[in-house]
Amino acid sequence: MEQVSGMTNTRRTLALALAALPVCALAGCSDDPASTTTPTDSTSSSSPSPSSTSSDPPTDSEVAEQAATQLATDYFAAVDHVRQDVKEPLKQLMKVAIGGQLAAQELLTRNQHKVGNRQVGDTRVVDIVIQSVNLDNSDPTAGRVPTVQMDVCWDVSDVDVVNSQGKSIVSPDRADRGWTRFTVANHRWKAQPEDGWRISNGQDLKKAPCSAA
């Protein structure tokens, strides 16, 4: 996203930046780097690995994958809600994001509300591909906590952003679908192995968008 500081007309520049709606503006990506190469051992959330028997309890890795998959949907829903209604408290984002991702999303939403813009419509999650699961929880105080890396294909064809006069500011060149790679971390793994997950950063991927479902 283009920097808006240093411009002579901050209000107009920010409105134009929001109108362009790059992927990270919608996904709320932080600036943390992430690899864009796709590991060969990835699995799609739509095709869960079969267990040996139906009575086998899920492994820790499977629990982490399921939690991350649900979090992707919850994350976009929370982002949509706070951008659609200025009265929605930003603290709701703390339930789905943490660290740089949370800070980036809070800043973007505050700036959007400040200039009178708001979102209309909901983002749709089309596909989720789990890239890796690392359950190392050896040093939580140093940030060494369980993580899941996942690629999410989103669809914003039903999403618009309007200004205070109700006029759309979305660029006609906006891509309606694309991929973002998210890192999901659980800093409360021992106490909350299922619901302690939060998105810590995200990065757009330069690859062909998924097909609309």
Regions found by a protein language model. Give the residues of each.
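Short, low-complexity, disordered segments immediately C-terminal to signal peptides
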Residues: 2, 12-13, 17-22, 29-52
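Sequence contexts marking disulfide-bonded cysteines in secreted/extracellular proteins
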Residues: 30, 154, 209-211
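Short, highly charged C-terminal tails/helix-capping segments
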Residues: 34, 91-99, 201-207
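Core segments of small alpha/beta cavity-forming domains
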Residues: 52-126
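Surface-exposed, charged secondary-structure patches
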Residues: 116-167
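Extracellularly exposed regions in secreted/surface proteins, prominently low-complexity, repeat-rich
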Residues: 170-213
